């Protein structure tokens, strides 16, 4: 059976998300949009946060967004569980020249989810607290695998 329900959600910062075949369930006062996706079941939702990062629980998702301060978030691929709240932090080091990517906080989970467990925990001011296990991101299709603890740190400007 074919479903043709196109839904577009717009956050207060102007981030537009085409949800495709989906139904908007709730719009959070701070701009988060929750949408149930029929193909994934009622319990699976897409979350568009205030800063424009899209998470799809249990499924990797490529996202392009813009940080309110102008920092560009490019093609994040972060497997996630429902209810995990990501926080925009500093771009990672070791990326190709001209590329910039922002990592979000992923809550520690008892079991591995698509190869990603506890990763970078980043505060609101961009302070890196910890890096452990594996963080998989993509920059224009390139997969970067951070496996060593405390290998990468945000740039410190004083």
Swiss-Prot record:
Bilayer-crossing regions: 33-53
Localization, UniProt: Membrane
GO CC annotation terms, alphabetical: membrane
Protein's membrane topology: Single-pass membrane protein
Lineage top rank: taxon: Eukaryota
Keywords linked to the UniProt accession: Membrane, Transmembrane, Transmembrane helix
Other notes: Almost completely overlaps SPT5.
Name of this protein: Putative uncharacterized protein YML009W-B
Native species: Saccharomyces cerevisiae (strain ATCC 204508 / S288c)
